[in-house]
């Protein structure tokens, strides 16, 4: 029996456990909540919010408020300075650095040892378990896993305490089993300079038998492009004949799918999406033919949801998982084994089915355009761009969009800044198809576009090569888990990028 079959047999029991998601949703989630309450009952937060008196879900909601990062920041700051038993039992030594809030450049998300084991690493194991269950002929453990990560640094110089990208924390604490199959070395994986890291990873990986990839699609594409440059090969399977799967997450895969299809032409190449955020591992594809992800309901995460049409109300409706409806857009609220209590993560999701609960990520609570009542979300944008690319043969590297509130002629429109990997023959046709698709899938956008009365036809501005990388670099955010803001209701991001785009030399285009 080969190594992959041995691993698959070992994980078969876990696949059976996941099958219980079909009829035990409420039971499993209430069990998670009970465990979280019990583990935090003697913490400062637990004592302040009466965890000793919490008997069920209703009593939990009455004693615990919904929180954003700003509400928990003072507690997290104290934890980062070494205080114990604040939001979670014991001392939390690791903090995932995430994109900031209105008031802060960065958020620092606590990652407890319990959160590492029962959420993040469990998610990685389950991704492998479900993939092998769908691909019994897999040979992924015949070779190595190319896993991309960010970097970390000491946390206030406290012993054994780190702050950095979640991926770096996962690599730092990885088991010997994972390290045996993983490349690059930990030293290279945790380098802070992404450009140096990319070069060293590519040089090392080209000599290995890589069978699987894990990382953010945009940064992985950058590394793989360098691998192809060094090797002189046409397709990735010419470098690594055993390549079979890419476990991806962090950003939507849709804009990159065609580029990966051209990079890896083998018909048996698979792509499996995971939803692993700094705050926890929440979902993964259990059917590679279905873009929806399975919500993982027996980890250290208790889920609640706020309908997006309630989000701005003083007392919005909040429902547990078993109270959601399919086809409705929700903001996700989580309570975790790292002390994030009823925490608004900032992501929005839409459920596609129940029992088991499957969903798609539709965007961010703060990444949308609703300047004129059009309520455009990231999922709309991704689907619109996909249609435009398919119709025109274009390929997209990166993009962002924002409203133009009123130009010199008193007209309002959406402005899209797009870096093409392959430009469409007609930018006008591309823009027209994108506009029509957005009207087809978003009735609010369609209404505002009616006869150009409220909203004019969208505008597309081609970005020079590497504009978005350069913008991230100017923010000290090149590489790792940093992402381009896809949609914004203000012009802050796009104006900065347009300024960099306008100052480019002709050869940059």
Indicate residue ranges for each PLM-predicted region:
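Long, hydrophobic, well-ordered secondary-structure blocks that form the structural core
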Residues: 110, 114-120, 246-247, 278
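Short alpha-helical patches at coil-to-helix transitions and adjacent helical residues
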Residues: 92, 117, 121-122, 217-220, ...
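Conserved helicase ATPase motor motifs in RecA-like P-loop NTPase domains
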Residues: 96-102
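Conserved AMP-binding loop of ANL adenylate-forming enzymes
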Residues: 130-176
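Short small-residue beta-strand/loop micro-motif enriched in glycine and branched aliphatics
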Residues: 104-109, 368-371
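Active-site diphosphate/adenylate-binding microenvironment
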Residues: 27, 31-95, 106-111, 118, ...
